From Swiss-Prot:
Gene: urm1
Family matches, as HAMAP family: Urm1
Main location: cytoplasm
Pathway it works in: tRNA modification; 5-methoxycarbonylmethyl-2-thiouridine-tRNA biosynthesis
A Gene Ontology biological process term: tRNA wobble uridine modification
Domain of life the protein comes from: Eukaryota
Entry-linked SUPFAM superfamilies: MoaD/ThiS
Family, similarity comment: Belongs to the URM1 family.
Organism of provenance: Sclerotinia sclerotiorum (strain ATCC 18683 / 1980 / Ss-1)
Keywords, comma-separated and alphabetical: Cytoplasm, Isopeptide bond, tRNA processing, Ubl conjugation pathway
Modifications the protein undergoes after translation, according to the UniProt entry: C-terminal thiocarboxylation occurs in 2 steps, it is first acyl-adenylated (-COAMP) via the hesA/moeB/thiF part of UBA4, then thiocarboxylated (-COSH) via the rhodanese domain of UBA4.
Function in brief: Acts as a sulfur carrier required for 2-thiolation of mcm(5)S(2)U at tRNA wobble positions of cytosolic tRNA(Lys), tRNA(Glu) and tRNA(Gln). Serves as sulfur donor in tRNA 2-thiolation reaction by being thiocarboxylated (-COSH) at its C-terminus by the MOCS3 homolog UBA4. The sulfur is then transferred to tRNA to form 2-thiolation of mcm(5)S(2)U. Prior mcm(5) tRNA modification by the elongator complex is required for 2-thiolation. Also acts as a ubiquitin-like protein (UBL) that is covalently conjugated via an isopeptide bond to lysine residues of target proteins such as AHP1.
Designated name of the protein: Ubiquitin-related modifier 1
1-thioglycine: modified positions: G106
Length: 106
């Protein structure tokens, strides 16, 4: 059985890149469907990023109660994810997902 995949770009700014090995851009090849056979969503991607990509143990700086932490702006192809259905947005080939921390220490 072959698994269909999607190529997407994920970017982190505003300090979030430090949670991802100080790498701002991540070109990812991910499965088109989750373990249940449903199309993968941004919500699935957030979990995938925490489980597979993030090397830092401070996952609570990125997620809170299984959701993207308040204070992190998420853009899907340069549009606010609130306009795209937030975590339920179904990922498409060549999507660009940008996570921006709007909270800065001082």
């Amino acid at each position: 059985m072959t698994t269909e995949t999607l190529n997407i770009m994920v970017e982190f700014t505003g300090g979030l890149e430090m949670l991802f090995s100080d790498q701002r851009n991540h070109k990812l090849t991910i499965p088109q469907t989750d373990s249940k056979g449903d199309p993968v969503t941004v919500g699935w991607l957030v979990n995938y990023l925490c489980e597979e990509i993030m090397q830092d143990s401070r996952k609570d700086m990125f997620i809170l109660d299984d959701h993207v932490r308040p204070g992190i702006l998420v853009l899907i192809n340069d549009a606010d994810w609130e306009l795209e259905g937030e975590a339920s947005y179904v990922l498409q080939p060549n999507d660009n997902i940008l996570f921006v921390s709007t909270l800065h220490g001082g």
